Amino acid sequence: MTPADPAGLVLRDMSREDVRAVMRIEVDRHPVDAWSSTAFHEALDRPDRYVCLVTSTGPDKSRDPHGRGAGVAAYGVISLAGGTADLDNLTVREDHQRQGIGRRLLAGLLEAAARRGAHEVLLEVRHDNVAAIALYAADRFVEISRRNDYYAPGLDAIIMRRSLDATHG
């Protein structure tokens, strides 16, 4: 998708070879409600989904010449229906957080959604995920609804929305 930035990160499409590395992060970051490897493979196969990831071009790029598998710092999935994109998953490896990687990945996903004809993006986030809510709010997402006890008793989902204007992407 894009060349490496000065920090040595590359935003690119996910491949099947990346799923094993992604699953290690997914289970670590979402131990209770992790996506399955089947869900990632199905997302890769569906034309209404877009899956990308951020990889490091640093010393841990050890799998193959294209960096598949090793060095995965973050990944995201959007699905598209009509003029709306849903941000289904955005996860940053714990040791790569607070470095702007989530912001870069979100920007790439929003650009991909706009290129595919989306006019708005919706997402849901746990009400106690303060860092994610701040990331989304900083990128002009606004809370439009709340689903009480959505994840579990006492764990609400905040529904957020952002318009994609003609200048985005």
Where are these regions (language model features)?
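Conserved SAM-binding loop
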Residues: 11, 124-125
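Well-formed, non-transmembrane alpha-helical positions, independent of function
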Residues: 21, 134-135
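A generic structural signal for beta-strand entry/edge sites
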Residues: 82-84, 120, 157
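Conserved catalytic-core motifs of GNAT/GCN5-like acyltransferases
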Residues: 122-124, 137, 142-159
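Short glycine/proline-centered loop/turn elements that form peptide/ligand docking sites
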Residues: 106, 129-132, 149-154
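Conserved hydrophobic/aromatic "anchor" residues
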Residues: 30, 40, 75, 135, ...
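Acetyl-CoA-dependent GNAT
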Residues: 3-9, 13-97, 103-116, 163-167
